[in-house]
From Swiss-Prot:
UniProt region (Tubulin-binding domain), positions on chain: 224-315
Main location: secreted
GO cellular component, one term: extracellular region
Subcellular location: Secreted
UniProt-recorded name of the protein: Cysteine protease-like VirA
Chain's gene name: virA
Protein's job: Alpha-tubulin-specific protease that is required for entry into epithelial cells and for subsequent intra- and intercellular spreading. Contributes to bacterial entry into epithelial cells by inducing microtubule (MT) destabilization and the formation of membrane ruffles. The membrane ruffling evoked by VirA results from the activation of host rac1, which is associated with the destruction of MT networks. Creates a tunnel inside the host cell cytoplasm by breaking down the microtubule infrastructure.
Complex formation: Monomer. Interacts specifically with alpha tubulin, a major component of microtubule.
Length: 400
């Protein structure tokens, strides 16, 4: 088995990207497993640029990987495989992922960039891989969507938690740039939302979208904001103006909510928790959405929803954000830090309903924002390291 593509590249470059062109023109059945693994890490298994046959070959290779046992994880090993007699190990150590493989009688290794690492994780088989104490990823899992409800009810259910995927460049996910896009991400999401799209909860209390829209406007988050700007916290009078414009001043029924939001909107850690949850790099890429749609169509599912042939009814995407205050072990935990910490759970739910069936995909990211975290790219980067994320991914298609 020739592994020169990877080995030579290891000597000349820290990234595998520069060798992709040397493999993409080769007939697929002539590629070595190293070349296939290279394409997976470079593009991801769900890349729309590859054929279904290529994706099948990639999936077959990735299915060879199994979770490593705890006693095998001295160097951070979390997955291993034996392919064509060659041992491959995937390791994560101090936030850096490396691929180890046996080349003759020598062990070769290559470090992955963060993008390559994410492509690798999203391509692992439906088994649970543990990556340290705070990072667990569950790879794609297939399920069955069974219902006897009529098509209109199925569509309504999907719409209630979804909004249209935004097709143009003004709102499309930007490059993976280490939180530099977060202000634009929340602006795009809120501006494009409607009553059935983004849902935001604090301690299970839904926060009205108009209230959030007024908040980000007062914070100066707009289409022209500098991506590296640190947000300036609002004064009591500024927050009070936002609250009074959204709740009737004389109505005592909203008094509890008004006091709650007045407190939250002056807490930098809450603003950090809220804005970071919209960072699109935490969630889903357009290629993943395209893959789900292609998968549903390629499976040739029977027309269960009784739609017109070739009718594409829904291509939707919803965003659900849950922020919960962390209950301190003692009263000093709040006073010493000047605020409280927040747990953030941010889910995105793209769904596709076509004449051929229903596809639902969920990606959920959970992390902790510590008390006093400042709403800035630097503050978010320090508060939310990549290894703290927990991502779940599922595809549901109709039972054939």
């Amino acid at each position: 088995m020739q592994t020169s593509n990877i080995t030579n590249h290891e000597r000349n470059d820290s990234s595998w990207m520069s060798t992709v062109k040397s493999t993409t023109e080769v007939s697929w059945n002539k590629l070595s497993f190293c070349d296939v693994l290279l394409k997976i890490i470079t593009f991801g298994i769900y890349s729309p640029h590859e054929t279904l046959a290529e994706k099948y070959s990639e999936k077959k290779l990735m299915d060879s990987f199994s979770p490593s046992l705890s006693q095998d994880k001295m160097d951070g090993e979390f997955a291993h495989a034996n392919i064509d007699g060659i041992s491959i190990r995937l390791c994560l150590n101090k936030g850096i992922c490396s691929v180890f493989y046996l080349d003759g009688d020598k062990i070769q290794s290559t470090q992955l960039s963060s993008k390559e690492y994410n492509n690798l994780l999203s391509s692992l088989p439906p088994k649970q891989f543990n990556l340290g104490k705070v990072h667990t990823i569950t790879a794609p899992v297939s399920g069955n969507f069974k219902t006897h409800k009529p098509a209109p009810e199925v569509i309504e259910t999907a719409i209630n938690c979804c909004t249209s995927i935004i097709p143009n460049d003004d709102y499309f996910p930007v490059k993976d740039t280490d939180f530099n896009s977060v202000w634009h991400d929340i602006y795009r999401d809120i501006r494009a939302s409607n009553s059935n799209s983004t849902k935001i909860y604090f301690n299970n209390i839904e926060i009205p979208l108009k209230l959030i829209a007024d908040l980000i406007n007062e914070l100066g988050i707009n289409e022209f904001i500098d991506s590296k700007k640190e947000l300036q916290m609002l004064s009591y009078n500024q927050v009070n103006k936002i609250i009074n414009s959204n709740f009737p001043q004389q109505d005592l029924c909203f008094q509890t909510e008004k006091l709650l939001f007045t407190s939250l909107f002056q807490d930098p850690a809450f603003i950090s928790a809220l804005t970071s949850a919209f960072w699109q790099s935490l969630h889903i890429t357009s290629s993943s959405v395209e893959h789900i749609y292609a998968q549903i169509m390629s499976e040739n599912i029977e027309n269960r929803l009784n739609f017109m042939p070739e009718q594409r009814v829904i291509n939707n995407c919803g965003h659900i954000i849950k922020i919960n205050a962390v209950v301190p072990k003692n009263d000093t935990a709040i006073s010493a830090s000047g605020g409280r910490a927040y747990e953030v759970s941010s889910s995105i739910l793209p769904s596709h309903i076509t004449c051929n069936g229903v596809g639902i995909n969920k990606i959920e990211t959970s992390y902790l924002v510590h008390a006093g975290t400042l709403p800035s790219s630097e503050g978010l980067r320090n508060a939310i390291p990549p290894e703290s994320r927990q991502v779940s991914f599922a595809i549901i298609s109709p039972d054939v």
